[in-house]
Amino acid sequence: MAVISLMFLAVMYVVHHPLMVSDRMDLDTLARSRQLEKRMSEEMRQLEMEFEERSRAAEQKQKVENFWRGDTSSDQLVLGKKDMGWPFQAGGQDGGPLGWILGNLWNAGLFCLFLIFELLRQSMQHEPAFESSSEEEEEEIRVVPVSSYTRLSDFPSQEALEAFYKHYIQNAIRDLPCTCEFVESFVDDLIEACRVLSRREAHPQLEDCLGFGAAFEKWGTLHETQNFDVLVPIVPPQGTMFILEMRDPALGRRCGCVKVDSECMCKHEKLLGDVLCLVHHRDHSAMLSKCTSSIKAALCTSSHLDVCKTVQWFRNMVSNAWALVAHKYDFKLTFPPSTTSCKLRLGYRSGRSLSISLVLGVQREDTLVYLVSQAPEQEQLTSVDWPESFAACEHLFLKLVGRFAPENTCHLKCLQIVLSLQDHQILPPGASRPILTSYHFKTALMHLLLRLPLTDWQHSMLSLRLQDLLWFLGRGLQQRSLHHFLIGNTYLPLTIPIPKAFRNAEPVNLFQHLVLNPVAHSQAVEEFHNLLAQVKTLPCSPVAGGL
């Protein structure tokens, strides 16, 4: 009987606690396991209550029967039946005190064994991480609740926010999806013409473009969608390879250098036996070294890709490619000066114009992280430093949210309303530019998308979610802390391809400069308070009472 009990316990443990696929349990599985444990505990409690009720009923019935039979030892018989339930008692004989003690020891041992297994399982959950094992599970990737807080008073109602959005935002970006589609199609046409021109040249090859930023991610306002940013990845030609040499992030700059070298397996692996290295063999090295030398002479500074030289080479190629495709389009194309990107300006006869920035990028490993040619305005880098960009990763995340979220969600509307008000904000005296940027608000929104279920972003919850967004950023300003969305974020879905080291890295504080500069922090706080005042008094819309 003891062996059967032990086997049953082992089987039940395997059924309810299956082996995990890795040493870290994802957040969805953790939530479901806790719900299952809670449900099992409630069911066990209910069964215990039912068992006790039945035992008391049987005891009472036995007492009544014994009383009518005239049995004066009814209480002892009933108690004896209760003691006979332990595995160490055989037949109808009473095991006595020793049997009762052994029975309790056996059950206590089983309980301790089960408790040890449970503690071991819990110890494997100390580092939760998002791991979507299927497309069905990706839809349920937000389970961490946002801390409760006091709702803002005099906040606009749902109707007021909708009226503001339709009047100031929706009409202004009505044609944005069609414009984005045209921009990508036009850039693809230019890239294809560039490939034709560079077919016989030993220069970097161009891959398919990727639109990113406010316009392509559908959260931009009229101001944010005046410029269209397009990423154009480049890869080395045959016989040449790019070696990425990353700078130390502790220095405060996330960038790297792109070293150009001859491609050869002997630089990656130790060749066995007398295997011939075709690159370094004297019969082939001359041709391949000529290819590498050509790139170094034209585009490099000390064997590293020079941003300015590479952009100028790309700009000249696009200019030549335009001559091949100009007959297809009815606008005038000009090239505004720039040293970090190839800027295009499309001028139509109607007076309308479009501005496009073609940003070159070198892919980091097999991820969506790129070293790009265009640096943020506040960073001063050398000509061989290529800043690290996570734009493609963030674009994919928002695309996944749009795919699995319910129809007509309000997450993009929240960001658009805030940015639209910020565009019309007057800077504090003495300030040359705002401290709070659209990227800060976008980062706060993406954090909230991970912390709240997608069902909480329905159309009817616009007012609540907008308050959540403002509260999240306001708390970050108060604490001088806003973590980067991708670096050190253990809740990030594994479907977002980033370097493995980024998931286990220390979070990067986007407000670190506010810690070091109290004046900048004061300006950021003032900008935030002005934004709150703007939200509470939306133009051309009534204000409702506090929520």
Curated annotation (Swiss-Prot):
One cellular component (GO) term of this entry: plasma membrane
Stretch forming the signal peptide: 1-22
Residues in the Cytoplasmic compartment per record: 118-547
Pfam families the UniProt entry points to: Mab-21_C
Domain of life: Eukaryota
Membrane topology note: Single-pass type I membrane protein
UniProt keyword Endoplasmic reticulum, yes or no: no
Coiled coil segments of this chain: 28-66
A biological process from GO: T cell activation
InterPro entries named among the record's database cross-references: ITPRIP-like, Mab-21_HhH/H2TH-like, MAB21L/cGLR
GO MF entries: receptor ligand activity
Role this protein plays: Functions as a ligand of CD3E, inhibiting TCR-CD3 complex signaling to regulate T cell activation. Induces stable CD3E-NCK1 binding, thereby preventing the CD3E-ZAP70 interaction and subsequently inhibiting the activation of the downstream ERK-NFkB signaling cascade and calcium influx.
Full protein name: Inositol 1,4,5-trisphosphate receptor-interacting protein-like 1
Species: Mus musculus
Gene: Itpripl1
